[in-house]
Amino acid sequence: TAGQLKAGAEETIYRALAIRHMELPVGEFITDALEKNVPDSARTLLESNVKDEVKHDLALTYITNAIGVDEKAEAEAFRLRDAWEAHPDHTILKALVAERAIFFVILPFFRFCGDSGIRTVSADISRDEQIHVACNSLVCSAMGLRPSNSLDKLRKATINWIFQPLGINTTDKYLDKNFWLDSSDRLMYEGKAPQLSDTRSARMPAFFEHSNV
């Protein structure tokens, strides 16, 4: 059953939930990568990660069954998903950027602003996603992959759309759009978001912290 969402965060929560439609495509990105020149040492873990994405999609679907969906947000999320699928960057790179700089921002948002059901599911997913990002980071490093400027622009467009309903310079930082946009930028470029230190998603390796030699 639905619980109480944080006042002022409702529309953004529905947009963030709509991004669940990217869970399975991220799994497909990884599956596609397994058919290419992925290091054998990473294959077993990557295959496990794909199974996790299916579980995440199912768990988030339970949440939407309880609290409902915003049909406009759902439609826009499908359009964003299509843009991610069509983007030419390597599939494992798309998975890494989506998980680290989008999912790692949405999950703390859920934990600060969602009801008890959303908070529980997001905590469970966060544990898996940390393993996914660490694994994908190492694979991208081993393959010498770095995100293109256009993939970064797609990341920015996605995160901006999710948090667009929030205000700016609000007294509650968790209702401040810039707080979350900055978190995404820092996770993307620095691999850490100190402002998310209350969560387990505050520190992941940045692209430049892995040697591509």
Can you name each region flagged by the protein language model?
Residues 1-213:
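Non-heme di-metal
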